[in-house]
Every structure is written in structure tokens, then in C-alpha cells.
């Protein structure tokens, strides 16, 4: 974290952290340079988390982009909001690096969430790998889309906890056959597109079985068997988890 004590020659001791940023935004370039220098270990860590450890990251294009992004974060940071600057700047750096990596490695990106997008697979018991292999892919990959999906899966874990589910539950209950997967995704889509059904789902923390069976002629046994998987898909489709959502819509042909 930044050492405010090192700014005593540049500012009054009573100046707050926000006041430092305010002065930088007002044009104090000496303070800006000192501020960025003190944050370089943090910036370097952000780069390392996304692209993996490389020799001399400080000489990399990714690090240069991260420095520019950090400077951008200073300029765009809203002093009146409660968002912490460190969290805000990390998100700006992440977005800029992801944009860069997508543009330079778009032809080499390993597809996360391939479980939903594997159109060439028969999805039988022998050919379908476990949930972690299909959903979480190689944790050491340095591709931007992997990183973004990893972050989204962490957020998904928090969402499904509210429905008394865990990622381990999804490992066990994920359907093995493509037809079943498509059926579950379509059921999830029905729920999110019908406000009354979604409200029931959200309030009860479970699927609206009666309404789905009566209105859409769906088999209750199938719904119950795949409840956790369908629930997770509803939560993704109703969220801002854009990478995971994209693969669902790709599978549905949208």
C-alpha cells in the first residue's frame, strides 16, 4: 500500500488520501509521479495476476499498458463515491489488459466454459470430463479470457451460496448429455424471460416446478434432477457475468 508518510515534503500532514488524488487531478505532476512510483509494486502485481509470471515484467508491453491504465484510473476516479481507489484502479488495469490481450491473442485463446460450447462432443459419460476440467480449465493459463472467466466463477460461487449450493454440487450434478444441457439452458431462459417465474424463483430460492410443468409441459422429475444446474444457469443469465453468459447464449444459438 502507498506510504503516505513519504509525502510530507509534498503536502500538509493533515491532507487525506483523497486530497492527494484531488491535488493530482488538479495538475500536481510532481505528486502524480511520486504517487505512481509508490504504487508500482501494486501495478506489477496486477499485471502478474493476469498474464502470469514472466521474466522482467517491468519491460513488458503489459506493464506499460498497466501504468497508463493506472494513470487513467487517477483521472477518472470519482472522489465523491465510496469506492476505494485501490479496487477501482485494479478494475481499470484489468479491463485495459484484457482488451490488449484479446487483441493480440484472440486466435490463441483457450475457450473456458467449453462444457456448454463443445458442439463436437457427444457428451456421453466416457467423453465428458469433470466440472473443474470443463469449467475452470488450466489455472496457469495467461490468456485474458481465462482470467476473466475465473473471476466470474468466483462471483458465481458467491451467488449460488444464497441458494444453498456449492461449486462441488455443480461438479456432481452437471448433466452429461448435450440434449439435457440444452434442455436445462432453455428452462433457465424461460425463467429469466418471464418476470413472474423469475420472481417466484428468486423468492422461493428454488425452481417454480408447478408453473413450469403446467404452463410448459415440462417433466417435474427432470426439473428436480437438474435443479442445481438450472439454478446456476438462471443466476448466470440474470447477472453481469458476461463471459459465462456468452457461452450459454452461443450454445442456444443466439
From Swiss-Prot:
The keyword DNA-binding applies. It is found in: Cytoplasm. GO terms for molecular function: DNA binding; sigma factor activity. The keyword Cell inner membrane does not apply. GO terms for cellular component: cytoplasm. GO terms for biological process: DNA-templated transcription initiation. InterPro entries: RNA_pol_sigma-I (IPR014244), RNA_pol_sigma70_r2 (IPR007627), RNA_pol_sigma_r2 (IPR013325). A motif (Polymerase core binding) lies at residues 61-74. Residues 209-228 bind DNA. It holds the Pfam family Sigma70_r2. Keywords: Cytoplasm, DNA-binding, Sigma factor, Transcription, Transcription regulation. Its main location: cytoplasm. Negatively regulated by the anti-sigma-I factor RsgI8. Interacts with RsgI8. HAMAP family: Sigma70_SigI. Sigma factors are initiation factors that promote the attachment of RNA polymerase to specific initiation sites and are then released. Belongs to the sigma-70 factor family. SigI subfamily. This is RNA polymerase sigma factor SigI8. It comes from Acetivibrio thermocellus (strain ATCC 27405 / DSM 1237 / JCM 9322 / NBRC 103400 / NCIMB 10682 / NRRL B-4536 / VPI 7372) (Clostridium thermocellum). The lineage of its organism: Bacteria, Bacillati, Bacillota, Clostridia, Eubacteriales.
Amino acid at each position: 500500500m502507498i506510504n503516505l508518510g513519504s509525502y510530507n515534503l509534498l503536502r500538509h500532514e493533515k491532507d487525506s488520501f483523497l486530497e492527494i488524488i484531488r491535488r493530482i487531478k488538479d495538475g500536481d505532476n510532481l505528486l502524480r509521479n511520486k504517487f505512481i512510483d509508490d504504487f508500482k509494486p501494486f501495478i506489477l502485481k496486477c499485471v502478474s495476476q493476469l498474464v502470469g509470471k514472466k521474466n522482467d515484467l517491468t519491460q513488458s508491453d503489459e506493464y506499460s499498458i498497466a501504468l497508463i491504465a493506472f494513470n487513467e484510473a487517477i483521472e477518472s476516479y470519482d472522489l465523491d463515491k465510496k469506492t476505494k481507489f485501490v479496487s477501482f484502479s485494479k478494475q481499470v488495469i484489468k479491463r485495459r489488459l484484457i482488451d490488449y490481450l484479446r487483441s493480440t491473442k484472440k486466435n490463441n485463446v483457450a475457450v473456458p466454459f467449453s462444457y456448454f460450447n463443445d458442439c463436437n462432443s457427444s457428451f456421453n459419460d466416457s467423453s465428458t470430463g469433470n466440472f473443474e476440467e470443463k469449467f475452470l480449465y488450466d489455472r496457469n493459463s495467461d490468456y485474458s479470457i481465462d482470467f476473466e472467466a475465473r473471476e466470474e466463477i468466483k462471483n458465481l460461487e458467491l451467488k449460488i451460496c444464497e441458494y444453498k449450493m456449492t461449486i462441488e454440487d455443480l461438479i456432481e450434478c452437471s448433466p452429461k448429455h448435450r440434449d439435457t444441457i440444452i434442455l436445462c439452458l432453455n428452462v433457465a431462459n424461460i425463467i429469466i424471460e418471464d418476470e413472474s417465474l423469475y420472481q417466484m424463483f428468486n423468492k422461493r430460492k428454488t425452481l417454480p416446478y408447478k408453473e413450469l410443468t403446467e404452463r410448459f409441459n415440462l417433466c417435474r422429475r427432470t426439473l428436480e434432477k437438474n435443479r442445481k444446474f438450472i439454478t446456476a444457469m438462471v443466476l448466470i443469465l440474470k447477472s453481469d457475468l458476461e463471459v459465462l453468459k456468452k457461452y450459454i447464449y452461443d450454445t442456444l444459438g443466439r
